Curated annotation (Swiss-Prot):
Optimum temperature is 39 degrees Celsius. One of its GO terms (biological process) is methanol metabolic process. It is a peripheral membrane protein. Optimum pH is 8.5. This is F(420)H(2) dehydrogenase subunit C. Component of the F(420)H(2) dehydrogenase (FPO complex) which is part of the energy-conserving F(420)H(2):heterodisulfide oxidoreductase system. The membrane-bound electron transfer system of the complex plays an important role in the metabolism of methylotrophic methanogens when the organisms grow on methanol or methylamines. Catalyzes the oxidation of methanophenazine to dihydromethanophenazine. It shuttles electrons from F(420)H(2), via FAD and iron-sulfur (Fe-S) centers, to methanophenazine (an electron carrier in the membrane). It comes from Methanosarcina mazei (strain ATCC BAA-159 / DSM 3647 / Goe1 / Go1 / JCM 11833 / OCM 88) (Methanosarcina frisia). Signal peptide: none annotated. The gene is fpoC.
Length: 158
């Protein structure tokens, strides 16, 4: 399956949920997904398009746009294509459905993203602290408006 076929399948199946889909190279594609459809799209990617490996989940902060993005990199063992799937989230209440039930390894990725950006993954089985000390919880140190840098970073607390 090539990049164009994957894009056509995604946009055909989810015409209202997928936007700005494009091919960056023969092996890299990108798309935005409606935050309320992200889990369903991931289920389709895994079940129908053989995107069986979640490589990462992370966040990006855009304070000037008043939003965060949840970013998923998903690959396939059956075809040489990596998909970057992004979901825009409002900065004041960034939440999205967890994909742990689709990709088991999303567990720690989502925990880390929650801890560092404040993106809440609904229905995550155990959204508890992973890397930050207790007194930094809720400070979202990777957001661009974090005021604790450089004195309140984990590196300086050790």
């Amino acid at each position: 399956m090539d990049a164009r076929t994957i894009i056509e399948s995604l946009t055909g199946k989810f015409p209202e949920a997928i936007s700005e889909a494009g091919i960056e190279s023969p092996i890299r594609i990108r798309a935005y997904v409606d935050k309320d459809k992200a889990k369903e799209v991931c289920e389709y990617l895994k079940g129908s398009l053989q995107f069986d490996h979640l490589c990462s989940v992370s966040g990006v902060d855009y304070p000037q746009r008043d939003e965060l993005e949840a970013v998923y990199h998903i690959a396939s063992y059956d075809h040489p294509v990596v998909l970057m799937l992004k979901a825009r989230l409002p900065r004041d209440s960034p939440e999205i459905e967890s994909v742990v039930s689709v990709y088991w390894n999303a567990n720690w990725y989502e925990r880390e993203t929650y801890e560092l950006y404040g993106i809440f993954f609904k229905n995550h089985p155990e959204l508890k602290p992973l890397v930050l000390p207790d007194d930094m919880l809720g400070e979202w140190p990777l957001r661009k408006d974090y005021e604790g840098f450089p004195n309140r970073t984990a590196r300086n607390l050790v």
